[in-house]
Structure formats: C-alpha cells, structure tokens
Amino acid sequence: MRRVRTTRLFQVACAAIVALASSAMSAHATSRIKDLANIEGVRQNQLIGYGLVVGLNGTGDTLNNIPFTKQSLQAMLERMGVNIRGATIRTGNVAAVMVTGNLPPFATQGTRMDVTVSALGDAKNLQGGTLLVTPLLGADGNVYAVAQGSLAISGFQAEGEAAKIVRGVPTVGRIANGAIIEREIEFALNRLPNVRLALRNADFTTAKRIAAAINDFLGVKTAEPIDPSTVQLSIPPEFKGNVVAFLTEIEQLQVDPDLAAKIVIDERSGIIVMGRDVRVATVAVAQGNLTVTISESPQVSQPNPLSQGRTVVTPRTSVGVTEDGKKFAVVKDGVSLQQLVDGLNGLGIGPRDLISILQAIKAAGAIEADIEVM
C-alpha cells in the first residue's frame, strides 16, 4: 500500500513539474526585438594577418621543410639590421602563424580586441610562444589593428621516444586583448534617415509582428516589413540626430516570433532537434532490425608423426542471421512533438533508427515540417 501511495505521489510530482515547465515556456514565449534582429550595418569585420611566434621550446617549424618560415625569419632579422643571408639557420623555436580577429562595430582607435593564432607550418606546439608585431588587414587591404603578445594554449602535447600524448589542439592559441585598433570604420548612425532591422531567422509573420509592435508603441506608422528578413524604420522627427535613443526604445519591445516547424538531424553524431510546432498526420510505423553475424575461426590441421604430411590452416566460417521482432505502432493525426517522441521511444527505437523513421515519415507526406540534415 505504501508503495502504491509513493508511486502516486511521484506521478503527481512529475505532473506538477511538467505543468510548471509548460507554464514557464508559455510565459517566456515572447522575445525582445534585440534578440530577434540585428541593425543593418552594425556588424563585426574580419581581420587577418601573417606573423611569427618565437620562444617555442623546440616545438616550432622545421625550417628545412617550411621554407616560408625561414624566409620570414630572415626578412625580419634583416629589418632589424641582422644579415644572415647564406648562413645556416637551425632553430626549432620559431613558427609561422596566421592571426585572425573580429573588429567590433564602433570600435575606436586605441581600444583592444582578442585575436586567435593558428600554426601554418609543421609546428607541434605553440605553448609558451610570443607573437611578434603582426599587422591585421581587412578585406580592403588596409591595416586596422596590430597584434602582439603571449599566447594562451588550451591543449598540450608531451612525447618521448616511443610514446606521445596530445590533449586538445596545441597548435592554436588566443591572445586576450592582444591587438590594438589603429583605424576606425566610419558609420554615421545618427545621420541616417531610416534604419533597417535584419531578422536573424527570416519569417513573414515575425517581420509583420515586429513592425506592428513598433507602430503600436510609437502611435504612428514608422515600421514597414519589406521582406521576410527586413523591417525598415523611418526615424521620427523627435529622434532626428538621436538615433541611438530611438533604437534603445525599439529593441526592448517584446514580440512573439513565429518559427517554421523544422527537424534538424546530425547523422554523424545521431543528434535530433525538433521544434515545438512539429505535427504528424496519421501514419503507421514498423521497425525491425536484421543482423547478419559472420565469424571466422581458423582450424589447424596437424598430421600424425612420420606421416609425410604437413601442418595447414583450414578456414572455418560460421554465418548467422537474426531478426528482431518487428514492432508496429500507429501515430495518430495531429500529434505534437512530445507525443511523437514518446511513441517512437515506446518502440524501443534508438537515435540512428529514429533518423531513418523521420525521413521515411517525411517521404510519406505525413510530417508537417522541414527536415534539415547536417
């Protein structure tokens, strides 16, 4: 009797947790415009540069195998007044690297940004290295920042004569605040007559809801959806020359986004992610596994003594076929995501089989969602 009561209490508790989770999801269904869209033109710019990392403990590039590292080292030393042309250079403490970073929007001259340093040659480990002065160029070929500093490596490598241990990626590192911005990208935000919002997930309904929320807040028709990914805003007269204040008011408005039903499948890892609006029509699902087992057990034939025979190995192969009992279930019309998952789990289906079943249901026209295979 106590066990039955405990089970019932557990079921009631689970039901309460599910109800609370459902109400929490409903309460947080809306999102800020700030989280749904970006301001067109306000973005990062990618920078790239080529440089040298020094101070490596014999884990740098092999100069005989990587000619550009040797040439870069010679050119750098010559700029400093050291002439080594014709000399034999034998060092494993230098590595050629590519330096990348993202120039933040509205970054001013003299501020700093993070950079990522990646080995370009056959360096084994960048641990303990220092990046020398490296100009970072934009897509237009201009220098926007200069990077230099000590690398922080998350991975490591240790090896001996007969064994080696590698953890993480020791040939990639980061330099926090390792680049100084030398050139600014001009963007006159306050002089714009209108501003465009670029939706992160294009959707007609969401674009219309964003425009409606902005117009209701301002009391005038200021926002207009142009396409499923763009909403154009006309700057009201009271905000002329103060676009920042206008956008500050707009981006805090709450909107209920409308997302298309989609199932994302990663076949390599077996991960399946389904949206809340996935619906399935009536469909019957049967699943069974056919397993073929082939085992090799070679036998040794040993002749009797003085029989003029010889020892031979004879193959012996056994083949077995087993088929799991097929399980059959009917998924009713209009079931939700949770019901679909529960029904398929009730068949004892694993992630790999679930991928095939979802694709088959989609091919049968019974699933109302797009399937994206990664």
Swiss-Prot record:
Spell out the molecular function terms from Gene Ontology: structural molecule activity
Where found in the cell?
Answer: Periplasm; Bacterial flagellum basal body
Does this entry carry the keyword Signal? yes
What UniProt keywords apply to this chain's record, in alphabetical order? Bacterial flagellum, Periplasm, Signal
Record-level GO BP terms: bacterial-type flagellum-dependent cell motility
Major place of residence:
periplasm
Q: Which residues form the signal peptide?
A: 1-29
Extract the NCBIfam families matched here: PRK05303.1 (NF003676)
Give the family from UniProt. Answer: Belongs to the FlgI family.
**Name this polypeptide is given:** Flagellar P-ring protein
